[in-house]
Design a protein with these regions (language model features):
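Single-stranded nucleic acid-binding surfaces, predominantly the OB-fold ssDNA-binding core
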Residues: 1-134
Length: 134
């Protein structure tokens, strides 16, 4: 990437101290409306060698936010233990013009399973169930 202009450089970023930055839009269709962005302090940026990329065995995505809960489903695989799954439509982007990022999830803890099961009737009744997740 750095020496070959035809390849994109690979860069590893380490972020810390996340915070929300609220502001009022000063132009565009939503001028005068409140909005916010998520910012972070850049702790480190370093080139990532392609050989190191090939040695990565586990990709880790750590995220938190709010979103709508949908499609709760009990799954009983033939060769494994049954589990509860659901979809989270995570909100992303400006508050006035949100976009959605969809995550199909396995509900991992008994506490979370209890909470999701409490919402099943509302979801089946076409009510929106907004959740916070991390």
């Amino acid at each position: 990437g750095v020496d070959d202009p035809k390849q994109r450089p690979l860069v590893r970023f380490r972020l810390g101290d996340l915070w929300g930055d609220a502001y009022i839009r000063d132009k565009g269709e939503h001028k005068g409306q409140a909005a916010a962005s998520l910012k972070a302090r850049l702790l480190k940026a370093e080139p990532l060698d392609r050989a190191e990329l090939a040695s990565i065995k586990l990709h880790e995505l750590i995220t938190r936010g709010i979103g709508y809960l949908s499609r709760p489903k009990d799954v009983s695989p033939k060769d494994g233990d049954p589990f509860l799954s659901c979809c989270v439509a995570a909100l992303a982007g400006p508050v006035g013009e949100p976009e959605y990022r969809y995550f199909d999830t396995i509900v991992a803890t008994p506490e979370a399973e209890h909470l999701v099961r409490r919402c099943v009737q509302a979801i089946e009744g076409d009510r929106k169930v907004l959740i916070a997740f991390r």
